[in-house]
């Protein structure tokens, strides 16, 4: 019997459909903000996740969070990214149309959130913002193991990366990723045959990737050693050729050259 599914539907697209269905079953966190980005209301999910963050990062009790700038509830390294999202405008100038969702990591607790903001309009015009987020931590990470001695818990280990493509959220398998390249507010994720944009920073990724497989060879590059092809020396610099569609030569910083050679078994 022939399948009724179009031949053009890829495995990745089928996985995206399955994940999208799961996402629809989630109870989202919802935060209402006024025109200045100050919190006016939470639903129960948002309070459960952001409440502890406010208590530990700001020393503010949950019942005192109302009226606080929502940016302050996130780690300092994530604040510029969130502020950029809240201030984003539609390229066509539409005051209602909202930017696409972003992935963001918060440290207290250690969670991965997909965040969407929508401008709200009342009879008198713009009146604030509705922020909706989905906690995709359990779909994208796993515990990294027990910390040694009484030390602080290690960040959870990533096994999938959430990205936004064609009006849907897709989870990329780490094993399919050749390299990551940092570029301003975004990180470009490169597979053998495609590229994706992610809002997760290289610093966030580096903490949550297996260091025996993924190495930050340069301030702007993390590579999967499984896709390394060749080390190329050019004058005083060293590049690593990666097995993506362009056979990209990734620069290797001097401080990482010896470590990279050791991991690759190169003398």
From Swiss-Prot:
Annotated InterPro entries: LytR-like (IPR046947), LytTR_DNA-bd_dom (IPR007492), PAS (IPR000014), PAS-like_dom_sf (IPR035965)
One Gene Ontology molecular-function label: DNA binding
Mutagenesis / variant outcome for changing residue 74 to A: Loss of activity
Domain PAS as annotated: residue spans: 15-86
Pfam families: LytTR (PF04397)
Gene3D superfamilies: LytTr DNA-binding domain, PAS domain
SUPFAM superfamilies per UniProt: PYP-like sensor domain (PAS domain) (SSF55785)
Entry keyword Transcription regulation: yes
Keywords attached to this entry: Activator, Cytoplasm, DNA-binding, Heme, Iron, Metal-binding, Repeat, Transcription, Transcription regulation
Keyword Plastid: no
Residues annotated as binding heme: 74, 104
Textual note on the cofactor: Binds 1 heme group per subunit.
Cofactor section: heme
Source domain of life: Bacteria
GO cellular component, one term: cytoplasm
Localization, UniProt: Cytoplasm
Residue ranges occupied by any HTH LytTR-type domain in the UniProt entry: 161-266
Additional free-text comment from the UniProt record: This protein undergoes a ligand switch upon reduction; the heme distal ligand is coordinated by a Cys residue in the inactive Fe(3+) (ferric) form, by Met-104 in the inactive Fe(2+) (ferrous) form, and by CO in the CO-bound active form.
Function according to Swiss-Prot or TrEMBL: One-component, b-type heme-containing aerobic sensor and transcriptional regulator that responds to CO by activating the expression of the oxidation operon cox.
Identification of the protein by name: Heme-containing CO-sensing transcriptional regulator RcoM 1
Organism, scientific name: Paraburkholderia xenovorans (strain LB400)
Lineage: Bacteria, Pseudomonadati, Pseudomonadota, Betaproteobacteria, Burkholderiales
């Amino acid at each position: 019997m022939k399948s009724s599914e179009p031949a053009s539907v890829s495995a990745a697209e089928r996985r995206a459909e399955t994940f999208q269905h799961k996402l629809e079953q989630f109870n989202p966190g919802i935060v209402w903000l006024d025109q200045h980005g100050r919190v006016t209301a939470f639903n129960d999910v948002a309070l459960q996740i952001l409440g502890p963050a406010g208590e530990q990062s700001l020393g503010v009790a949950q019942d005192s969070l109302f009226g606080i700038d929502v940016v302050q509830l996130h780690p300092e390294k994530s604040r510029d990214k969130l502020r950029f999202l809240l201030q984003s405008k539609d390229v066509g100038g539409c005051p209602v149309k909202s930017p696409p969702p972003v992935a963001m990591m918060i440290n207290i607790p250690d969670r991965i959130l997909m965040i969407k903001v929508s401008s709200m309009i009342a009879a008198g015009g713009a009146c604030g913002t509705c922020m909706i987020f989905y906690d995709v931590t359990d779909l994208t990470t796993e515990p990294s193991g027990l910390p040694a001695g009484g030390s602080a818990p290690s960040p959870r280990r990533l096994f999938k990366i959430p990205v936004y493509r064609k009006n849907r959220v897709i989870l990329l398998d780490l094993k399919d990723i050749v390299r990551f390249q940092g570029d301003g507010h975004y990180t470009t994720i490169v597979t053998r045959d495609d590229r994706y944009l992610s809002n997760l920073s290289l610093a966030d990724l580096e903490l949550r990737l297996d260091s025996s497989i993924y190495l930050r060879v340069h301030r702007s590059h993390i590579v999967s050693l499984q896709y390394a092809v060749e080390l190329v020396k050019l004058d005083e610099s060293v590049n690593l050729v990666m097995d993506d569609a362009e056979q990209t030569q990734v620069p290797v910083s001097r401080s990482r050259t010896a470590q990279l050679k050791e991991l690759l078994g190169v003398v």
